[in-house]
From Swiss-Prot:
CDD domains: PIN_YqxD-like (cd18720). It comes from Syntrophotalea carbinolica (strain DSM 2380 / NBRC 103641 / GraBd1) (Pelobacter carbinolicus). Belongs to the UPF0178 family. Pfam families: DUF188 (PF02639). It comes from the Bacteria. This is UPF0178 protein Pcar_2632.
Amino acid sequence: MKIWVDADACPAVIKEILFKAARRTGVSMTLVANHLMRIPPSPHIHFMLVAAGLDAADNEIVKKLDAGDLVITADIPLAAQVIEKGGHALNPRGELYTVDNIRERLSMRDFMDSLRASGIDTGGPAALNQSDRQAFANRLDQFLTRHV
C-alpha cells in the first residue's frame, strides 16, 4: 500500500501530519504537484513533479495508483476515479470517500458549479481548523492501523 498526495492544494499542516505518519509507519508516500516543494529527507517520502496543466497531477496519480492505495485529496472527481480503480480517498478534513458517498459528493459539487456558473456566489469552504486537523490525523491513523 502506498499513499499518494494531490499536493498542489494540500494544506501544509496536513502534509506535516502525513510526513510524520510515513516516517512512523514506513509506508511509502509520494507527493504529486506541478510546482517544486520541499519534502523532509526520508526513504519513505518522495516527490513527483508533473507538467503544469489542468488535472496533470490528478491524471498521474490515477495512472500510478494500485488498488488498495490511499490518495489524499479534496478533489472530488479525482476521489471518484481513485475509488473506481479500487483505491481509497481521504480529504484533508478527515472524510473518507467511499463507494457509498462519492456519487452524492459529485452531485453536490456539480450542483454548486451550476450555481456559480449562473452567477450565484456560493462562497468557499471554511478555513481548516484544529478539529479538522485532528479529524484528519485520527482517520489517517485508523486507516493505517487497518491497512498496514
